[in-house]
A protein has these predicted regions:
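Short hydrophobic beta-strand element within catalytic cores of glycosyltransferases
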Residues: 288, 293, 297-300, 310
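Nucleotide-activated donor-binding/catalytic signature segment of Leloir-type glycosyltransferases, i.e.
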Residues: 234-257
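Conserved acidic donor-binding segment of nucleotide-sugar-dependent glycosyltransferases
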Residues: 288, 312-313, 317-324, 333-339, ...
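Acidic donor-binding loop of glycosyltransferase active sites
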Residues: 264-279, 296
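N-terminal subdomain of nucleotide-sugar transferases
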Residues: 1-47
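Conserved donor-binding/catalytic core segment of Leloir-type glycosyltransferases
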Residues: 6, 143, 179-208, 224
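Carbohydrate-associated surface elements
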Residues: 148, 169
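Short His-centered aromatic/hydrophobic patch
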Residues: 90-96, 114
């Protein structure tokens, strides 16, 4: 009989959280998924769980963190009794603390998948640190995106033996066949328009680059930015102030297929990730891996897990966070040296294909779930 996994996640709707949907598609198990933002009238237990998650959120805002762990945990316990899974997989640490007590009450093994802000945002991390310590007493397995994330959780008592580092990975079926040497002088950025993604710094660097290029390259250089978010208006103002409206395009949201097509039309991929003012940082950006798997060279920062995937001078060019001048120079190298772009892109594709595809990620997650389920079974078969 195949392993039965109950997957709990805070949201099905977030457009940027395609990795949760990817796990639903790719993990080779029987899967039951329940999302905290859904309240389906035809499924009373899932409806009650959605209401309980809302109550848990409200109690968290009020600072009643211990009490906040009870409402959703109670409905999760009922879900466990109803579905009788072999193991529970919870996406995001902040969601796991809402439901974690159900694992202790039921004996169902608990695996938690940390993604990024749940292990880095200063306000969130500090507020939940005691709850995380309790969480680590109840977990059988932990999945993290990078070594810095692993170290952050270990500082709160997470067991390194139960932890696996596994970036979410890129899909080879979508991301392939870029030819940066033959592409126009076009740079591409993909990600939510939030502080940790550094879209403002990316545009500032591009503005510096354009100002020093000679014609005709100066007029031909382009920067395409895919994504939406709270910085969108500020970003558009910056583009207008720099008189770059003809060369910087804010494309909004695009489907994975459209992003893959854009990557096949670009010279390089750029992302100036930084630690945000609230302490939020990346895990290991999926778009960086998708770009490399496509065959694009990457210009990015030495931030979070990025240096674990992008090797400076081999598969891309890395600069320090907030060093806009170095970012401009690295972008310029890709536009001025198409042969360099091709060499870096080819090496990046090999690196991701050999260790950072979504299939590698599914294999790692499957291993954690199987080991956790094998350690103990809560149900009498």
């Amino acid at each position: 009989m195949p392993l039965h996994v109950l997957l709990l996640a805070p949201s099905r709707r977030a457009a940027s959280e395609t990795f949760i949907r990817a796990n639903l598609r790719g993990l080779p198990f029987r899967k039951t998924a329940v999302f905290g933002d859904e309240r389906p009238l035809g499924r009373p237990l899932a409806f009650a769980h959605g209401l309980a998650v809302l109550l848990s959120k409200a109690l968290t805002v009020l600072g009643l963190l211990r009490l906040a762990s009870l409402p959703a945990a109670c409905t999760t316990w009922l879900l466990l009794q109803r579905h009788r899974p072999d193991v529970m997989l919870v996406d995001f640490g902040f969601h796991a603390v809402r439901v974690m007590e159900a694992a202790g009450w039921s004996g169902v093994p608990l695996v938690v998948h940390f993604r990024g802000s749940d292990a880095s945002s200063e306000s969130k991390f500090q507020r939940l640190r005691d709850r995380y310590r309790r969480l680590f007493q109840l977990t059988d397995g932990l999945i993290v995106k990078s070594r810095p994330m692993q170290q952050a959780l270990q500082s709160l008592g997470a067991d390194s033996e139960s932890m696996v580092i596994s970036p979410s990975g890129a899909d080879p079926a979508l991301f392939h066949r870029a030819d940066p040497a033959a592409a126009p002088p076009r740079l591409l950025a993909v990600g939510r328009l939030v502080a940790k993604k550094g879209p403002l710094q990316t545009v500032q660097a591009f503005a510096r680059l354009v100002a020093r290029l000679d014609e005709p390259l100066r007029s031909r250089a382009e920067l395409l930015i895919v994504g939406e978010g709270p910085l969108q208006d500020q970003l558009q103002e910056l583009v207008d102030d720099q008189q770059l409206s003809g060369q910087v395009q804010l494309l909004g949201l695009r489907s994975p297929q459209q992003i893959a097509d854009l990557m096949r039309s670009a010279r390089g991929f750029v992302q100036h990730s930084v630690v945000a003012p609230d302490g939020d940082s990346e895990g290991n950006p999926v778009a960086v891996m998708e770009a490399q798997l496509s065959g694009l060279p990457v210009v990015a920062t030495r931030h979070a897990g990025i240096p674990e995937v992008v090797l400076d001078g081999d598969t891309g060019l890395l600069v320090e966070e907030e060093d806009v001048e170095a970012m401009a120079q690295a972008m310029g190298r890709l536009l001025l040296e198409p042969e360099l772009a091709a060499r870096l892109g080819a090496a990046g594709r090999r690196r991701v294909a050999n260790g950072f595809t979504v299939q590698h990620h599914w294999f790692a997650v499957s291993g954690v779930l199987e080991r956790s389920a094998a350690a103990r079974s809560p149900w009498t078969r």
